[in-house]
């Protein structure tokens, strides 16, 4: 039986994410591995230069969904502890937007649980990303509006 610490760390924050402290938080003497995912702001998206990002969330529901993810990975993988922290607000290029760390006695469980956590977070947690470019902004996974027919024929 794997001993779990009293509490996983599941947070939405508006300041820089301290990834080193989260790695220390999940580490236990019974663990043999920590697997982490560090998602950060890149300087381009779909061939366009990104200036910055803004994240918004439906916070009560987002935290509830993060708790569901943590509960699932505790139930289905042999892990010790998980930290899932997502940043909200304005983020510059290179800043961490989401950090997940999973500790476990063995690396396989930690890898699988971390992968499940980020993939499920992206699909189910109500957090939205708006990308800002020199020529405008778009919500992530959204499409740019189609070019009007008159603009196409003018070119």
Where do the PLM segments sit?
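Short hydrophobic/aromatic beta-strand micro-patches
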Residues: 101-103
């Amino acid at each position: 039986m794997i001993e779990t610490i009293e509490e996983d760390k599941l947070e939405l924050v508006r300041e820089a994410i301290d990834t080193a402290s989260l790695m220390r938080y999940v580490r236990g003497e019974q663990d043999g591995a920590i697997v982490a995912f560090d998602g950060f702001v890149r300087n381009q998206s779909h061939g366009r230069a990104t200036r910055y990002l803004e994240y918004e969330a439906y916070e009560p529901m987002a935290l509830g969904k993060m708790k569901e993810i943590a509960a699932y990975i505790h139930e289905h993988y042999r892990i010790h502890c998980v930290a899932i922290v997502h940043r909200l607000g304005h983020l510059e290029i290179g800043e961490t937007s989401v950090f997940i760390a999973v500790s476990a006695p063995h690396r396989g469980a930690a890898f699988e649980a971390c992968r499940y956590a980020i993939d499920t977070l992206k699909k189910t947690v109500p957090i939205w990303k708006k990308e800002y470019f020199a020529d405008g902004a778009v919500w992530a996974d959204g499409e740019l509006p189609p070019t009007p027919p008159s603009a196409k024929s003018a070119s």
